[in-house]
Amino acid sequence: MTSQPAAPPLPPPLRPDVTAQAISQAAQAAASAWAQPMSPAAHRRAVSQLYSTLRDLGIAARRLADYQTAGHPSDPTPLGFPQHIAASARCFLATCDSLDGVLAPEGLDPVADPTEPGTELCHAARSAIVAWRQPYGTSAELDTTVRQIVATTSFLAAAALSLTTYAPRRLAIHLRAVHVGLTKATDCLMKAIQVPGPAHEAPGPGTS
């Protein structure tokens, strides 16, 4: 009896910063597309894709809070990084919740055009859940990762406002709430990569 050949190993996930850049580029393309006039069906699909993206970013960001820097102790994650990233994840999920019940999530509809910017954005955000499962890298890569997420958040906030143009009144209110929530997420992300201030030290000789 011959043995079956072993399945090829799965490719390693992309580096967190590479994944974050791909999401940022997809968010920019989607925001540009959603700023154009669209049919009611396309508008519903765009809002659903925004919902799915926010949900998956929230899930992925919770895992990014466990980022481990490679190298030696002189290259640590910034002080308070896990807490600020976790707070940003809560903001993403809260903005997602603000759309829950207003429109059913259809962001990964199998019949959607795979080349549509919103569909590509959904897949990019979904990929982060795997890519950031056990995140590690240098502190420079961490800084790039977070800055790319900040850019993504900015694009999504602009997209939410664009989508209010053709939205019914109730949905428009919720989309504006998304914009506010993403502004809060940006604040948390920027705090996550700020260089901590100097530690409080005992005064040296001759100081008061």
Model regions and ranges:
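Non-Sec secretion/translocation targeting segments of pathogen effectors
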Residues: 1, 205-208
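Long, low-complexity or tandemly repetitive, helically biased scaffold regions used
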Residues: 9-11, 18-52, 56-184, 194-204
